Structure formats: structure tokens, C-alpha cells
Design a protein with these regions (language model features):
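Flexible loop/hinge segments at secondary-structure junctions
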Residues: 21-210
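Acidic, metal/ion-coordinating pockets
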Residues: 206-362
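Ser/Thr-rich, Proline-interspersed low-complexity disordered segments
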Residues: 1-31
Length: 362
């Protein structure tokens, strides 16, 4: 029996103890940065930047990484407004103090106590900057009715975003500064609205938009009737040919396109000017062309009554003088086709054409 094999039961290896995985707290997901846009910003500014933002617009200023609002804290751009009136308005300039006084309830002497007409958004923009206006000092009007309302209430004035100006408005300077001027500086202008960015401005681009781009503006000046005859010509003989431009020459040279409506032909041997001349047959000495050269003439109108006073030869000679100086002309010419052609300019993407006629005797 001692020789019998001993049975040894197999050993069982205990398996690993299962680990109990209980629920854990979720790791918070970081929120993308947001931008907060103040509701009192100009509508047109909000419309432009909202379409191209690469960052989410938030509803809370406190949670936003970038804040955009009116104010001088960290100015990135200025939104330009114009003080406008119906085109037949006589005054050209209004003082900052008169605007401020009118806003606060004082009576405008320039516009006979008229309220300042503006849209609801413009009211919100300037209330943020100037405080709430006095009762009755402004009148809110829908944007599509503003122009008609102000025209019906003449004499009257309005605050108009620069991009909404139309030819029927006359833009008034404020303390001598107008947004139509070539040397306009928005930071010096009372009606430019500063827009500031607070926070991490590197997170978003395209906030420095403007509603006044000088690269899209064209200045056209029209002198009206120009006749270098009688007392004007006599004064030029006395004080120098360029004397009439002494005080306005620099201003005329600012124009991108300067129009001159020269009434009379240039005639060699034209009689010496008589300031008391009673007759109505006129000509100018060709040396007077120096005046038109000095002010930067770009186009000449020939519809004046007296262009034919010295006959066809004088007219044709005058056209040659213009051609020699590369001055295009219209409303008259060497033949019907020449007289009927338009003079066209293209500047900063703007197209300007001049046409004219004289219907007297027609």
C-alpha cells in the first residue's frame, strides 16, 4: 500500500479581484472665447462686423473675453456722423456749443429752435456719449422718412450717419470741420463716435472698420459762371492775373475734379478791360488762362451765353487753347458731335460725367 501513488489535487489560482469603477465627476469643457457688443453701437457698425466675426457673440459682458463699446478707453476706430440740413439751407457752419446747448434743451438760433432730427439708433449712440437729451430737444424719425421729414420742417437739421448722406442733404461744418474735407481728421471732429475694444483684442480681427473711407471719396467743385471781363479783368490787370484766386486757390486745388464754366472766348487783341463797360459783347485776354491753370482746372463748360460773341474763329481758337492744356470741354465744340459729347471721369471707383446745353433761342 505504501507503493500506491499519492493523489494531489490541482491547485486553483485565484483570479484578480474585480475593480469597482464608480461614477466620476465630468471634466469641465472649456468654453470658446466670446465677444460682447454694446447695444448702443451704431447699427451699421454692428451689421458690418457681425457678418465676419470668427468669435462667438456672447450675451454677458462679464463672461466675454472681448468687449466692444462706444467710448475713449481704447479707441480702435471712429464712426462719423454729419450734421445735415436740406440742401437750400444758407448757413454753412454750426458751433459745437450750439449743438450741445440744443441737446440739453437750449434753443438753436441757426435753425429757429428746431429739434435735432435723428433715428432711434443715432439717439442711443449719442445718448451714450452726451447723456440723455432734454425733453423736446430731439425728434426720432424712421430712417426711411428722415430726409422727407426734415425737408418738410425747414429750417431744420439732422444727425445723419456719414454713409447715409445723399445729394439732397447739405453737410454743415462743426466749428469749421466737415467730414467732406480732404484733410478731415475724425479725432478732431465733434460728431465722430469713438469705438473702443477692451480685453484680449488679439482674439478677433476686423473691428477697426470705418464708415468713411477717403479712398472711396471724390470731390467735385463747380465754380458756376466764370467771366474774366469788365471789373474782374480790370482788377486782374491791376493786382495780377492770379489775384482772384488769392483767398480760394488752395481750396480749389483740393478738388479731385474742378469744373469751370467759362462764359467767354479768349481773343488775341481783346480790348483792355473797362470796369464800367455797358455793352454785352465780351472777350478775355489769353494771358488770363494763367488764372485757370493756377487753380487746377480739369474740365471747362461752354454753355455760356457769350461764348460766340466774337464769332466762330474766336471760338475755335479758344478750343485750341483748351486742347493744348488737355482740358476737356462740353456743351460746345467745333461741330455738333463735338458739342454733344460727354466728359467722363473715373476716380476712386466713382464715375462722373458732364453734359450741358444752352437752349436760348432754341
Amino acid at each position: 500500500a505504501d507503493d500506491q501513488p499519492v493523489f494531489i489535487p490541482p491547485a486553483f489560482t485565484e483570479g484578480p479581484t474585480p475593480t469597482n469603477f464608480g461614477p466620476s465627476d465630468p471634466t469641465p469643457t472649456s468654453q470658446p472665447p466670446q465677444i460682447w457688443l454694446d447695444a448702443s453701437l451704431p447699427d451699421s457698425y454692428l451689421e458690418q462686423i457681425s457678418s465676419g466675426l470668427s468669435i462667438q457673440v456672447g450675451k454677458s459682458r462679464d463672461q466675454a473675453a472681448v468687449v466692444v463699446l462706444p467710448g475713449e478707453e481704447n479707441v480702435i476706430t471712429r464712426w462719423v456722423y454729419a450734421l445735415a440740413a436740406p440742401f437750400p439751407t444758407i448757413p454753412d457752419n454750426v458751433s459745437e456749443s450750439e449743438i450741445r446747448s440744443a441737446w440739453q434743451g437750449g434753443e438753436s438760433t441757426t435753425f429757429n429752435g428746431s429739434p435735432i432730427f435723428l433715428t432711434a439708433n443715432t439717439l442711443e449712440v449719442f445718448s451714450q456719449l452726451w447723456g440723455d437729451p432734454a425733453e423736446g430737444s430731439v425728434q426720432v424719425t424712421a430712417a426711411d422718412q428722415l430726409q422727407e421729414t426734415v425737408w418738410d420742417r425747414r429750417p431744420a437739421w439732422a444727425l445723419v450717419p456719414f454713409e447715409n448722406l445723399e445729394p439732397s442733404w447739405k453737410v454743415l461744418a462743426v466749428d469749421g470741420i466737415s467730414p467732406l474735407q480732404k484733410d478731415f481728421a475724425a479725432e478732431e471732429y465733434y460728431l465722430s463716435v469713438p469705438i473702443s475694444v477692451l480685453g484680449n483684442s488679439d482674439l478677433v480681427s476686423g473691428l477697426d472698420l470705418s464708415n468713411r473711407d477717403p479712398e472711396q471719396l471724390t470731390t467735385v467743385m463747380l465754380t458756376g459762371v466764370t467771366a474774366l471781363v469788365r471789373a474782374t479783368a480790370w482788377t486782374m490787370e491791376t493786382n495780377g492775373v492770379e489775384y482772384p484766386a488769392r483767398d480760394i486757390g488752395d481750396w480749389l486745388l483740393e478738388a479731385d475734379i474742378l469744373h469751370i464754366s467759362n462764359e467767354v472766348p479768349f481773343v488775341r487783341g481783346c480790348p483792355y478791360p473797362d470796369p464800367g463797360q455797358s455793352g454785352l459783347r465780351f472777350c478775355s485776354n489769353p494771358k488770363y488762362l494763367r488764372l485757370l491753370e493756377s487753380i487746377g482746372t480739369d474740365v471747362v463748360e461752354l454753355t455760356g451765353d457769350h461764348f460766340g460773341d466774337y464769332g466762330p474763329e474766336a471760338m475755335l481758337n479758344t478750343l485750341e487753347l483748351y486742347n493744348f492744356r488737355d482740358w476737356p470741354y462740353y456743351g460746345g465744340g467745333k461741330n455738333r458731335a463735338d458739342a454733344q459729347k460727354a466728359v467722363k471721369f473715373e476716380h476712386n471707383g466713382n464715375k462722373v460725367a458732364f453734359i450741358g446745353c444752352n437752349a436760348k433761342g432754341g
